Amino acid sequence: MGMTHPPNNDLARRMAELARAAAAPRSVEQVLADVTAAAMELIPGTDTAGVLLIGKGGKFDSVAGTSDLPQRLDELQMLFNEGPCVEAALDELIVRTDDFRSEDRWSKYSPAVVEIGVLSGVSFKLYTADRTAGALNLFSFTPHAFDAESETTGVILAAHAAAAILASR
């Protein structure tokens, strides 16, 4: 049995790997898939992750999902014109929902995701100094899955994703 490293060592190691990988010629989709995979690995409680991109003319695009679920959740947000991923992409830096069963910010979206089995989530704006690219979105099948440490790690991953997106445009 090997030594277990403290979580921040894992974070530092994974971020270094992501940075090196991003330096290689790769598509944005590949970089974002690396980021969502890293989120699954580094942020306890994450059952699925994806990225919602804002395209030209404000069109949204769901990419880099670790399952089909993030795209379904993004589609519900488009349908209802409300939800945490859209809010993070457009307005807030971090949007955390501890329990969708008691979440009243999104009257249509919240009950729809509970029906699917998603009970908590956290979304991070992907932005640089002058432009917004979208949101990194993490979801869990358990309530209260995310905490301040989840947010810290997510912000770092989101910054990496944003840099990769903007470098490619």
What name fits each language-model region?
Residues 4-63, 72-74, 82:
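Helix-loop-beta substructure at the N-terminus of cytosolic sensory domains
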Residues 8-11, 147-154, 166-167:
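Interdomain signal-transducing alpha-helical coiled-coil linkers
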Residues 48, 110, 123, 135:
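Short hydrophobic/aromatic beta-strand element in the GNAT-like acyltransferase core
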Residues 52-54, 62, 70-107, 111-119:
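Regulatory sensory and allosteric helical modules in signal-transduction proteins
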Residues 120-126:
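Short hydrophobic beta-strand micro-motif common in sensory/regulatory domains
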Residues 135-144:
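Short beta-strand-to-loop transition segments that serve as allosteric relay/switch motifs
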